[in-house]
From Swiss-Prot:
Superkingdom of origin: Eukaryota
Source organism of this protein record: Drosophila persimilis (Fruit fly)
TPR repeat segments: 452-485, 492-525
Cell location: Nucleus, Nucleoplasm
Descriptive protein name: MAU2 chromatid cohesion factor homolog
Any single Gene Ontology cellular-component annotation: chromatin
Similarity-based family: Belongs to the SCC4/mau-2 family.
PANTHER family: MAU2 CHROMATID COHESION FACTOR HOMOLOG
């Protein structure tokens, strides 16, 4: 008996020594992965017990995944670990860690997520007795369903997680599940359900989270969702108090005296869940601030915050290039592209569209490109439209409409298509698209900004039919919606069009009353398209009132805006990235070569000057 014990002790000593050596080689600078793997491989020569064997296979799989490109070997080790661990009792950490890592590997290597989901479903089923693992696996599985746009399934899993956390008395974890579910419901546009969940979660955060640091983290998550909820509805004014609160909360969390995430969440296993680390939350708050600034019509602010956020992203990428940082970067670039176009910097916009394309193409399996392809087509459509390539713009918007499942993006693209049909005098196509938009959005609650835009396009349509009374009716509706929520760009576009309506019916006093605030707002934004249009109206108004000096000033301004746009147009068509206007399917082309000279396609000065029938700008 003593000989057996001695042999077992000796074998244990070998295991411990080999594991210690393996860890030593792994943590060396630089890591000696080959020797680390050799030490772990040597363990198998001792015919170790099942639990040791399974744990070693798991470690081998993790090391091969983290430090090598030998994914097939990693998969073999992880599958062996799972086959050994699955039937074993009291072996939860290795069993469920293996399932989690193996699911990640399947996601990285497989064409579909089917195998990863099946693996996690089995692990969820086996883990019901272990709240920590059950909740962790539920979160992982719901994330995959959400990425696959299977939102109902993701929502159901998160509801199960909230119940499990509640049964275990894990209040912090329950709130995380509630807020995660609210986020999914927001994507599904289930407005009332989102509000109910946010109210429930908000009350728990206020009254039932004793740890002040955890409370602040949950508050940031809650406020991000609340801000996104209001912004999705175009409620730029309503959101201001929540946004201010969010900005104060993130400053609190980023303060030097704030404890580390490990100190806040490391004490209790059921509190070891963090939505996003604070450095990523910091970027996210910048992102929603950029979104708010852009919607409110503060382009300079949006640019300033974008630059800060992109700098922060690059710092974080140097530490560890997490996939979510690429997502943040693409969304920021999408926002700033629209700001550039409003300001008339279209050459910079196409460069930034190309930068967004590069970020998407750098992500494996084109997963980011698949999610953002429709948005990229929409941005290229806006760019094509602003550079008077209307055929390209139309095709880009149609691709966007066909690719996207997001109702707001579809509405946005359709409104711009309507403006193209107006500009190109395609009345039948215009009627068809306006009827379709009207039917689709009558029974649903869309963004106030987009619905205001819909009324604006109808006003524009009425103006071009010389139905001035009808145009005024639509534009007053637009102004009512825009003023209610401080949508400055929509306000300035509506005012300048209304001014043109009054000019057309000979009411110069009302025309002046509209164009003056339009120009003031446009210079604040700044919106070069409204300034160009407004300066043409002012020139006509001053000529009518025989005010030669003011007429001369307005004309000088008009020429300045026009020349700026023409100079920018010239740069655009000489840019290598201009070739993106011809991308309609598959992967976008790489456009970093020599500039393609298409000078023959530069519009003449008159094409950019707002004579009657041409001064529409884009609706973005």
């Amino acid at each position: 008996m003593s000989t057996t014990n001695t042999a077992a002790a000796s074998q244990d000593a070998c295991y411990i020594s080999l594991l210690g050596l393996a860890e030593y080689f792994r943590t060396s600078q630089p890591p000696n992965v080959k020797k680390c793997i050799q030490c772990l491989q040597a363990l198998f020569t001792f015919t170790p017990p099942s639990k040791v064997e399974a744990r070693t296979h798991l470690q081998m799989g993790q090391i091969l995944m983290a430090y090598t490109k030998n994914i097939d070997m990693a998969r073999q080790h992880l599958e062996k670990a799972w086959n050994i661990a699955e039937p074993l009792m009291n072996f939860d950490d290795v069993k469920f860690d293996t399932a989690s890592v193996l699911a990640q590997l399947h996601l990285q290597t497989d064409q579909s997520s089917h195998t990863a989901k099946a693996m996690l479903r089995r692990a969820v089923e086996l883990s019901q007795h272990n709240v920590y693992w059950h909740c962790k696996l539920l979160l992982q599985l719901s994330q995959i369903h959400a990425s696959d746009r299977e939102y109902s399934l993701a929502s159901e899993l998160l509801a199960v997680g909230a119940e499990s956390a509640e049964e275990a008395g894990a209040t912090y974890l329950k709130v995380l599940f509630l807020l995660s579910r609210a986020m999914i419901l927001m994507i599904e546009r289930k407005t009332n359900d989102v509000l109910a969940l946010l109210n429930t979660a908000g009350q728990i955060i206020d009254n039932n989270i004793p740890n002040p640091h955890q409370k602040e983290y949950l508050k940031v998550f809650f406020l991000v969702l609340q801000v996104c909820y209001y912004l999705a509805l175009g409620q730029v004014k309503t959101v201001k108090p929540s946004l201010k609160q969010l900005q104060m909360s993130i400053q609190t969390i980023m303060a030097p005296n704030w404890p580390t995430d490990e100190a806040i969440f490391g004490a209790n296993q059921l509190e070891m869940f963090v939505w996003l680390p604070k450095e990523q939350l910091y970027v996210l708050v910048y992102l929603v601030t950029v979104s708010h600034s852009m919607m409110a019509g503060y382009m300079d602010k949006a640019q300033k915050y974008t630059e800060k956020a992109l700098t922060q992203i690059e710092k974080l990428k140097m530490q560890e290039d997490k996939p979510i940082l690429s997502v943040f970067k693409v969304i920021l670039l999408e926002h700033i592209v629209m700001c550039r176009m409003v300001m008339g910097n279209r050459e910079l916009a196409i460069r930034e569209i190309a930068a967004a394309r590069d970020v998407c193409l750098a992500v494996p399996h084109r997963s980011l490109l698949k999610r953002h392809s429709a948005q990229l087509h929409c941005l290229i459509g806006l760019y094509s439209m602003s550079t008077s390539f209307f055929e390209h713009a139309e095709r880009q918007f149609l691709v966007c409409v066909n690719e996207t499942t997001e109702r707001d993006l579809k509405l946005f693209a359709n409104l711009n298509l309507a403006i193209i049909y107006l500009r190109t005098k395609r009345d039948a196509d215009l009627k068809q698209i306006l009827d379709a938009v009207s039917t689709e959005n009558t029974h649903t609650y869309s963004s106030q900004a987009l619905m205001g835009g819909f009324y604006y396009v109808q006003g524009l349509h009425a103006f071009h039919k010389n139905s001035f009374h009808e145009a005024k009716r639509f534009l007053r509706e637009t102004l009512k919606m825009a003023n209610a929520e401080d949508l400055n760009r929509l306000t300035s576009c509506s005012l300048v069009l209304l001014s043109h309506v009054f000019l057309s019916i000979g009411n110069s006093k009302e025309s002046m009353n509209m164009v003056t605030p339009a120009m003031q707002l446009a210079s604040k934004i700044p919106d070069i398209h409204v300034q160009l249009w407004g300066s043409a109206i002012l020139k006509d108004l001053h000529r009518m009132s025989k005010d030669a000096q003011h007429e001369k000033d307005a004309y000088a301004n008009h020429v300045k805006y026009s020349e700026n746009l023409i100079a920018d147009q010239r740069k655009c068509v000489q840019s290598a990235h201009h070739e993106l206007v011809n991308w309609f399917q598959g992967d976008p082309p790489v456009t970093s070569g020599a500039a393609a000279l298409i000078l023959s396609e530069i519009p003449t000065t008159s094409a950019l000057q707002p004579t009657t029938g041409q001064q529409f700008g884009q609706f973005y």
